């Protein structure tokens, strides 16, 4: 009898596990909506977005051009907070909603929300596991790891994170906005590490994409910039 009950329990656990990884259309639709709301305002402020598309975004989101310009990051952060509440609820119920559960590119929705939150340290182990299990592209793991490290004042690994600060131009004496790739640990190996992680571009090419002239800096050099 005990053996019989044990078998039933094992089958029940297996069935529950299988149910957890079954494709979930309703969850996919919810995450697609979350992903859209995460990206739409960032699309608006992207320098490559044309004026017609910007007008479409304003109409779709219900903001006037003046209203959005006055409180751009306040609006974005408010939406980020709403999205984070939703994603944390989803993670609590399903774990990371990866490729098996919601397909691609929906499997990136939770990643974007966490990447834009203040809770990267809490959820990075979950993201790393999802990447290892091929539920999300490992380049996303690398990008989040870089953001986590740089937020802690440490060197990044893959050179995915750029930044900028206002400094005094020594030649002109005027204030300039200086953009740079945040310091990298072992910069001589960065392109090899990027390739292993799945990136198709070099650190130099990635910097150019961000309109940054790539140069190697140490943490001390960046901290002493004025």
Set out the residue ranges of the language-model regions.
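Bacterial Sec-dependent N-terminal signal peptides
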Residues: 1-24
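Short acidic alpha-helix initiation/capping motifs at coil-to-helix transition points
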Residues: 118-120, 182-187
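Long, hydrophilic "mature protein body" segments
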Residues: 70, 74, 180, 221-223
């Amino acid at each position: 009898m005990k053996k019989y009950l044990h078998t039933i329990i094992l089958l029940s656990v297996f069935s529950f596990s299988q149910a957890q990884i079954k494709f979930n259309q309703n969850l996919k639709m919810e995450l697609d909506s979350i992903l859209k709301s995460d990206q739409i305002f960032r699309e608006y402020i992207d320098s490559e977005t044309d004026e017609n598309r910007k007008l479409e975004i304003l109409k779709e989101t219900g903001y006037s051009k003046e209203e959005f310009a006055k409180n751009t990051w306040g609006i974005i952060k408010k939406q980020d907070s709403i999205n984070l509440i939703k994603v944390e609820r989803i993670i609590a119920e399903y774990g990371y909603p990866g490729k098996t559960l919601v397909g691609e590119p929906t499997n990136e929705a939770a990643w974007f929300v966490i990447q834009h939150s203040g809770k990267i340290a809490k959820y990075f182990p979950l993201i790393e596991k999802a990447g290892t299990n091929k539920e999300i592209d490992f380049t996303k793991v690398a990008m989040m790891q870089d953001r986590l490290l740089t937020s802690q004042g440490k060197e990044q690994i893959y050179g995915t994170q750029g930044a900028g600060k206002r400094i005094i131009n020594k030649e002109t004496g005027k204030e300039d906005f200086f953009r740079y790739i945040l310091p990298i640990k072992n910069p001589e190996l960065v392109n090899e590490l990027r390739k292993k992680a799945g990136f198709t571009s070099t650190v130099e090419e990635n910097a150019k994409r961000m309109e940054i002239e790539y140069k190697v800096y140490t943490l001390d050099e960046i901290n002493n910039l004025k």
